[in-house]
């Protein structure tokens, strides 16, 4: 997900917000998260999240809930969300 960070004025401020989001997504939704792009931008962050599930519907629901949570609980504006899943077996 690509986020515009409204309150960040320095890279340090940005990293605090991004770290808080990643930690909350990990603990609340059991997602593996990382900042994957836009590392030098003060105003924008791109966070990637992943999970493994035996149900594509469950996986998509968890990711939708996580995106909604970020939008509702952090001073950010959502710019882009991309979902990709693979089925093995």
Where does each model-flagged region fall?
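A structural signal for short, well-ordered beta-strand segments
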Residues: 1-3, 47-49, 81-85
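Generic secondary-structure boundary/loop-capping signal
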Residues: 2, 8, 39, 75, ...
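Short beta-strand elements
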Residues: 29-36, 77-83
């Amino acid at each position: 997900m690509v986020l515009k960070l409204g309150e960040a004025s320095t890279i340090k401020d940005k990293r605090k917000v991004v770290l808080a989001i990643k930690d909350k997504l990990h603990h609340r939704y059991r997602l593996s998260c990382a900042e994957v792009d836009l590392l030098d931008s003060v105003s924008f962050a791109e966070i990637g999240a992943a999970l493994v599930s035996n149900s594509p519907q469950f996986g998509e629901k968890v990711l939708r809930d996580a995106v909604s949570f970020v939008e509702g609980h952090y001073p950010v504006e959502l710019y882009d969300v991309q979902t990709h899943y693979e089925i093995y077996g």
